[in-house]
Each structure stands twice: as structure tokens, then as C-alpha cells.
UniProtKB/Swiss-Prot annotation:
One of its GO terms (cellular component) is cytoplasm. PANTHER family: GLUTAMATE-1-SEMIALDEHYDE 2,1-AMINOMUTASE, GLUTAMATE-1-SEMIALDEHYDE 2,1-AMINOMUTASE 1, CHLOROPLASTIC-RELATED. It comes from Shewanella woodyi (strain ATCC 51908 / MS32). Its cofactor is pyridoxal 5'-phosphate. Homodimer. Pathway: Porphyrin-containing compound metabolism; protoporphyrin-IX biosynthesis; 5-aminolevulinate from L-glutamyl-tRNA(Glu): step 2/2. This is Glutamate-1-semialdehyde 2,1-aminomutase. It is found in: Cytoplasm. CDD domains: OAT_like (cd00610). The modification N6-(pyridoxal phosphate)lysine is found at residue 265. The gene is hemL.
Amino acid sequence: MTRSDELFEQAKKTIPGGVNSPVRAFNGVGGSPRFIDKADGAYIYDADGKAYIDYVGSWGPMILGHNHPKIRQAVLEAVENGLSFGAPTELEVKMAEKVIEMVPSMEQVRMVSSGTEATMSAIRLARGFTNRDKILKFEGCYHGHADCLLVKAGSGALTLGQPSSPGIPEDFAKHTLTATYNELESVKTLFEQYPEEISCIILEPVAGNMNCIPPVEGFLEGLRAICDQYGALLIIDEVMTGFRVSKSGAQGHYGITPDLTTLGKVIGGGMPVGAFGGRKDVMQFIAPTGPVYQAGTLSGNPIAMSAGLAQMEELCAEGLYQELAAKTKRIAEGFKAAANKHGIPMSINYVGGMFGFFFTEEEKVTRFDQVTQCDAEKFPEFYHGMLDEGVYLAPSAYEAGFLSMAHGEKELEETLAAAERVFAKMAK
């Protein structure tokens, strides 16, 4: 029994399922999760001392790599002044200014402490601003675990939402409509059905919680036009994509202007953080300037702001995103080439520093139903093969992979060589 195995058994006695977030339990791939002791650059190290090339990056925030010296130094300096004040600080002003500088659609910003808090607050604000109750989300898109957002289509894209978890009253879920990602017609039908009841559309501009699904051409533009036509707000959830796919997020990459944006992950440099912002007239509707209430004890935490600002400054370096995208393309295309070489069908998607791969014969995966029809047996086999080779991927076929600027030529070559060996074994 490894030290990770021992820790997992110990954890299950005091923590539900032995983990503090379900995907970490390895239920999607089987076996026991690796307990991590430390991380540096492109590597994480488990409790048994084994090193892994990491393509999870704490689920996205570690875009510069783990334990980056400038971020670490910023945190250490901030700690010297205290951990939390419950009062305004200059750091949170600087963070808001930096976000607004990099994302033009965000005229004002409110800091919170998690992505869930950001999306939950943005939804409440949209409902208050429009005086409408219903929201529209997409099947397979994840926006945190707030009650109104843990909903997917019941019996097709055009049905009223059904709760995806016990503990969510149907009275909450009935106000959440679910459409099919990358299919505008399903959205149009719902707006025709409820023309004056839908407050907003919320979506991941690159769906990173059904693996990695970019928007098809015209999809985001179509959503913008529908919102304008019916007086609804467009909320782009960039908790995952913000400053991950480009300097101005997915909205900058695809040239789309939302009314509200939610952020997290990258803006904290590895610390707990979230934010939402957008049009000034909408943001002025939130307390204390408006009637929509939102608050948080640790919002704008100085340690998180310090870490985030240090990371954001580094992300402004010339050519950084082009280099990151090139690395991501190399890994994704390399996986597909190695799989196909050994007669294993694979489809890939990648945008900026995100990538996904699917064990399927379909040339392109653009919808959630295609993701669910992929080969369910090949992913765990590939996953554990790569884990044995010292490559740490997301332990679920429904999660995107992430690269960092710390992934160099050595790590890329070793990863692709490992994939070649694993696919060769799988083909036997």
C-alpha cells in the first residue's frame, strides 16, 4: 500500500469520500487518488515522492507553473502586513484596474472568493437588473454548485430544468432553462416560448467541464444577437477561460462583448478568488449603490490580490499566449497522432492553454451528447497508463487539460513519448 493509499483510507474516516471536491476521488478512472506533497514548475510530487508532469495545474490557475518565484514572493510580502482586514485595500483597487485594463467589456468589477460565488452573484444581479426570473444555461456547462445552476436538460434541450442533485427544490430548478451548446435553434425556441421571462444567458465560451468544447462559428455572435433582441443579459463565464486562452480571455479571442463576465482561477495565482463585472449601468445595480445585495467576509483578500496581481503582470509579457498556444497544440496534435498510429480513434480540441481529447471515431466533437458517447473504457486505461509513466492528467473524461509556461521542451517530449508507449500497449 502506498502512502497515498494510506492517506486516502485515513481521509475517508473524516472527510466525505476522502476528498473535498468529488472529481479528486478518481471515481471517473478508478483506483486511489494521488495525495500531493508539493509542486514546482511543471511538476507535482505525491506523498510517496514520485514526480509527475502536471496537466491539471490546480484545474487551471497555475498558468505560469507551480510555485512561481514572483507569485511566491508577492504572497510572502503580503503576509507580513496581515492576512485579512475586512476593509478596503489598495490591492483590490489595483486588481480591479488591471482586470478592466485587460478585459474592455468589464467597466466595473466586484471581487469575491470563488467561481461559484461569482456566477451566483452575476445571476442574481441579472435577475434584479432585468426584473425577470428565468435563466438559460447549456447542457454540460458547469457554473459552480449554486442551486439554480446545478441543472441540466431533463428529456431534451427544450424541457424545463430538473435538479441534477438532491437538495435542490424543483421550485428553484423550474426557473432554469437548458439548451444545447453550439445549437442556436434550441436557444431561439426557448426565447420564443418565454420572450419576457428570461433574464440572461450564461455559458462557458469554451466549455471546459464536458472536456474541451470550443464554440462553433457564429454561436457566440448568435447568442449576443438573441440577448439584444429580447432584452436579456449575456453572461460569459470565464472562470476557466479568463486569461487562459488569451490576454483578454475567450471574449477577446472570439471577439464577443458580454454584459457581464465571471472570473476566477488565474486571477488568484493559486489562491481562492473569484470576480464578476461588466457594464457600469448593470454593476451599479448591486449594493451599496443599488438594491441587489451581495457581500463577502473575505472578498478582496489581500493575500489573494497580491498573488493575482503578480501573476497578471507576468501574463502581459509579449508573445506569452502565442507560446502557450503552440505548446498546447503540440500536445493535443501529438496525442492524436500517437493514438491514430496504433489504430485508436481520437478526436481533439484545443484553444489557448486548454486542450481535450476524445476516444471516438467522430472527426469533430462539438456537443455534449457526442462527449457522452465516447469510449468509456479507453479513457481510464489511457489515464492510468500515463499516470504510471509519470504524467498527471485530469482524472475524468469530462475535464479539460491545461498547460503552463513552465512546460518546456523536455516535458513536452517526455509526455508525447509516454503517450506513444501507452497507446502501443492499449493496441495489443
